[in-house]
From Swiss-Prot:
Purpose: Inorganic phosphate and probable anion transporter.
Gene label: ANTR5
Signal peptide range in chain numbering: 1-23
Keyword Transmembrane attached: yes
Swiss-Prot/TrEMBL keywords: Golgi apparatus, Membrane, Signal, Transmembrane, Transmembrane helix
Transmembrane intervals: 50-70, 78-98, 101-121, 140-160, 164-184, 229-249, 273-293, 305-325, 331-351, 360-380, 405-425
Principal location: Golgi
Protein name (database record): Probable anion transporter 5
Sample GO molecular function, one term: phosphate transmembrane transporter activity
Amino acid sequence: MKLSNIPQRYVIVFLTFLSTCVCYIERVGFSIAYTVAADAAGINQSSKGTILSTFFVGYACSQVPGGWAAQKIGGRKVLLLSFVLWSSTCFLVPLDPNRVGLLVVARLLVGVAQGFIFPSIHTVLAQWVPPHERSRLVSITTSGMYLGAALGMWLLPALVELRGPESVFLAEALAGVIWSLLWIRYATDPPRSEHPKAAAAGFGGALLPTNVNHHKVTHIPWKKIMLSLPVWAIVVNNFTFHYALYVLMNWLPTYFELGLQISLQGMDSSKMVPYLNMFVFSIVGGFIADYLITKRILSVTRTRKFLNTVGFLIASAALMVLPMFRTENGVILCSSVALGFLALGRAGFAVNHMDIAPRYAGIVMGVSNTAGTLAGIIGVDLTGKLLEASKLVYSDLSHPESWRVVFFIPGLLCIFSSVVFLLFSTGERIFD
């Protein structure tokens, strides 16, 4: 089948799916490559935590500006610029754990560049995706994150073993360039004739205007957005989701290496299972949400609350029992359940900003993702400090108690966040 025969909105969804996939290959890849290089150089866990968390400082700084830029310039252009910037940085900067200053600057630049990605994607999707396909198409796009993480965990340790840690940077830069060329070739802004007739089919309002400079969208209701309890319900859950995700993504390699004394290079494809599980559960969650809504089984509000609550509470239980398991299979099982149900919960909070503010989807996503990025800064850096403190008590990190508080913190946050979402979220449009 020719690409021209496929509805353009599905082409856009596929390309944005690939973009999130490539981004998370980069994030997992840096964690794997840097862990190997830093351990070989004798870098301590606290310093590792600082370097790993530096990305999130830049990422946090560019979330809201990314939403603003996508709103004013257009998500398609901003997304391309982001890919060009982070790919160039990966290509040009050498991986040397002893050159701390250079690594800090490089990770800040990559973080700033990637911070524009998700606000841009959601601005593009808000223009292309009709309400009755919203949950599943947005979930398909974001599921690329987890497939990327799974592929990174599967392929990149072998690449490190064969070619060294530096080769990971070059592979990631190449992937970014290839995606950019595909985006230039196939991505377009939606003409009115391309819009699916969602409203006529009885599934809600029309899509956004295609002209981002239209006079009706020049005024952004910042005060109303920042004082909205439903927005804060999304923000709190985004913080918790990313705290759990980034702690596992950045420290699970160390947990296997030092906590269980298992080499990542020696593990089989099981190390990709937690992220592959996220990929599957994310898509399943989107289809369940759309089914419940379009079949009128539950309202949009109840659907979002139901999936968010189920996902976060089961993930909480899995996170808190994870350090009790001392085998490779046990840890793979617990981390798979935790990450899988967190991904299911994204059919609640992570699509909700398009329910309540479709016109300002990129802006609300930027605000929400800022909180998620702060979670990365806090969680990744705090974990390094907690592990250094544990070494003073237990002498090394192979003792299970060294890791208990690391996984209890995101577990408790999941419970708190699910309660906040139950109390304050809504599926109704509250911003014109």
